[in-house]
Each structure stands twice: as C-alpha cells, then as structure tokens.
Amino acid sequence: MIRRRYRGCTQGAWIVSVGMLFASCTSGAWKASVDPLGVVGSGADVYLYFPVAGNENLISRIIENHESKADIKKIVDRTTAVYGAFFARSKEFRLFGSGSYPYAFTNLIFSRSDGWASTKTEHGITYYESEHTDVSIPAPHFSCVIFGSSKRERMSKMLSRLVNPDRPQLPPRFEKECTSEGTSQTVALYIKNGGHFITKLLNFPQLNLPLGAMELYLTARRNEYLYTLSLQLGNAKINFPIQFLISRVLNAHIHVEGDRLIIEDGTISAERLASVISSLYSKKGSS
C-alpha cells in the first residue's frame, strides 16, 4: 500500500514538474499583437500569402530542392498560413508562419549537434542560426524564418520588427486575402517586376518585357491551379503586341482595364507553378 502511494506520488510529482517546466517556458512567449507583413518588412521584390490547407502538394514541390528542405518542412507541418517576402538583391526569403508550434522545445528541435547556433535578442527572444536558414519561434502561435544567401538579413533585425513593424504598401485584394484568417485557400502573390515573372510563365525567360507590378491569385483545382492575373502595362506603344503575345500562349480570358492587363480563368499545373515560383529565388533565376 505504501509502495503504491509512493509510486502515485512520484508520478504526480513528475507530471507537475513537467507542467511547471512547460509553463515556465511559455511564460516568456511574445504576448503583444503581431503584424505578419510588418515583420517580413518593406522593399521586397515579391510578396506572397500562402494558406497551407489545400496547397500542401505545391509547397512540397517548391521546397523540394532547397538545402534546408527538412528544416523548412518541420515548420510547414505546423503552419496554417505563410506570409512571405523575397528580396532579389540579397537572395533571401523572409517568412512569417501562423500556426501551432512547439515553443517550449525549440532547444531540442534546433540543437547545436545539428548545426544550429542559439542566440537571444535584446528583448529576450531566442533564435537559431545555421548556414542557410535562421529560425525563431517567439510564441506558440507564430514562427519566423529567413533562408537564402550569406547576404541575408540577420534574424535579430527581423525580430526587431515585432516591436517596430515595417509594413509594405500592397494592393487591396492582396491585403484582403491576407486577412482571410484561414477561410480562403487562395494563394496570393504581388511581384514588383511583373515582366520578369510573366516571361517565365510564358516560357520565354530571355525576353525582356517593359511591364510594371503584377498581382496573381491562385486556387487549387485537382492537380492544377486556376488563376487570375493583373499586370501593370508600361510603354503604351507596345501594349497591343504584348497583349497579342500573351493571348497566343496562355489559354485564358484576356482584356485591358485602364493601364492594366487582366488575365482570368487561366490554368497552370502545380508542377509548372512550383517551377516558376522556385525560379524567382534560385541562383539562376535571381542572378
């Protein structure tokens, strides 16, 4: 009887200890409100909003050949939506993920033996650096990731924008998709140099089209994506040739509204879309 009571006490003490450990770990979590786009920052060449549900196959294809594929997948598996920015000059992606993360066990997940170096910001937020990728989980409901070249921004700088957000100015529809809070599965992209992206979509990567900013919205449908694209036209003298070229290559409804070329009901395979998106940050695509 005494032994049973002792065993019960030790088991209870163990449970309480673990609970206290977990509580003490989460007590230091970031509790203030967070602006995802303000954290990734302004001045990017590409912005994206990526709900994970319904788009898992596309995400797997995009990160398939990345050096930090396994580490990125750890984060994605716990993510409901990604807010991202790509910076061509420094060849880096900054990602803010909303979801459910193992905040209390980051030291076990991102261990020194696996090549991670642990550091803290002036606000006491822990982050982990490796050769290609830097990660921080400031709270159980969001994470921050930077991956890219050695010129990429330091994670401490990104985390400083939790306090002082640097929010980019983005189109109304893009903003609307970002605030859908998981109710939409639409992938949204805003690209500063629309000509660079559209030539890859047309499969004419060497063609230099004088085009402005582009908005792209994609919805998964079986193994392909249905998309709507809005492209700012540049030189009025060549607008018609550009419209003609695009209409000959893309199977979609195309028309002009003011200074914008609108492409609706276009389709693209998940494999092709992943290739085009990946080319935006690949060494070849971002040189």
Curated annotation (Swiss-Prot):
Q: Where are the residues of the annotated region Amphipathic helix 6?
A: 172-179
Annotated consequence of substituting residue 162 to E: No change in detergent partitioning, vesicle associated
Q: Where is this region: Amphipathic helix 4?
A: 103-112
Task: Summarize the impact of residue 277 to E.
Answer: No change in detergent partitioning, vesicle associated, decreased dimer formation. Amphipathic peptide (residues 270 to 280) no longer forms alpha helices in the presence of lipid vesicles
Pfam families according to UniProt: TP0453
Biotech / industrial applications: Recognized by sera from 43/43 syphilis patients, it shows promise as a diagnostic antigen. In diagnostic tests for syphilis this protein exhibits a sensitivity of 98% and a specificity of 100%. A fusion with TP0453 (residues 32-287 of TP0453 fused N-terminally to residues 38-450 of TP0326) exhibits a sensitivity of 98% and a specificity of 99%, and both proteins exhibit superior accuracy in classifying analytical false-positive samples than a commericially available test, making them candiates for diagnosis.
Q: Where is the lipid attached (S-diacylglycerol cysteine)?
A: 25
User: Which InterPro entries does the record match to this protein?
Assistant: TP0453
**Which residue intervals make up region (Amphipathic helix 2)?**
56-63
- Kindly list the places in or outside the cell where this protein is found, as annotated in its UniProt entry: Cell outer membrane
Q: What is the effect of changing residue 201 to E?
A: Partitions into detergent and aqueous phase, decreased vesicle association
Q: Where is this region: Amphipathic helix 1?
A: 36-40
User: What subunit structure does UniProt give?
Assistant: A mix of monomer and dimers; may integrate into the membrane as a dimer.
Please give the function described in this protein's UniProt entry.
Might be involved in ligand transport, alters membrane permeability at acidic pH (4.0 to 5.5). Incubation of the non-lipidated form with lipid vesicles increases their permeability.
* UniProt free text on domains: Forms a U-shaped beta-half-barrel with a large hydrophobic cavity (3549 Angstroms(3)). The cavity is opened when amphipathic helices 2, 3 and 9 move away from helices 7 and 8. Has 5 potential amphipathic helices (P1 to P5, residues 56 to 63, 155 to 162, 194 to 202, 240 to 250, and 270 to 279 respectively); P2, P3 and P5 form helices in the presence of lipid vesicles.
What is this protein called in UniProt? Outer membrane protein TP0453
